[in-house]
């Protein structure tokens, strides 16, 4: 597991109040991990803080799974 993947999974577990072991790449935030719309907004904000990035609303709407979040962080994190 990459450092970014581990950081993303840790943030998701903390934000959604689930065990890190439940946070696997294919899980959807709402359907699988019980997130609501406020949770997803807070999750995006936590990812922005962790990786020093800004996630526009149109991109945030597409981040619906753990893998989406990992891919976005990998692609957009500041060096």
From Swiss-Prot:
Residues annotated with O-(pantetheine 4'-phosphoryl)serine modification: 37
Annotated protein name in UniProt: Acyl carrier protein
PANTHER family: ACYL CARRIER PROTEIN (PTHR20863), CARRIER DOMAIN-CONTAINING PROTEIN (PTHR20863:SF76)
Entry annotated with the keyword S-adenosyl-L-methionine: no
Free-text function comment from the UniProt entry: Carrier of the growing fatty acid chain in fatty acid biosynthesis.
Cited InterPro entries: ACP, ACP-like_sf, PKS_PP-bd, PP-bd_ACP, Ppantetheine_attach_site
UniProt superkingdom: Bacteria
SUPFAM superfamilies in the record: ACP-like
Location(s) in or outside the cell: Cytoplasm
Pathway recorded for this protein: Lipid metabolism; fatty acid biosynthesis
GO (cellular component) term, any one: cytosol
Keyword Lipid metabolism recorded: yes
Family the UniProt entry places it in: Belongs to the acyl carrier protein (ACP) family.
PTM annotation: 4'-phosphopantetheine is transferred from CoA to a specific serine of apo-ACP by AcpS. This modification is essential for activity because fatty acids are bound in thioester linkage to the sulfhydryl of the prosthetic group.
Keyword vocabulary terms for this entry: Cytoplasm, Fatty acid biosynthesis, Fatty acid metabolism, Lipid biosynthesis, Lipid metabolism, Phosphopantetheine, Phosphoprotein
GO BP of this protein: lipid A biosynthetic process
Gene Ontology MF: a single term: phosphopantetheine binding
Gene3D superfamilies membership: ACP-like
Ranges where the Carrier domain occurs: 2-77
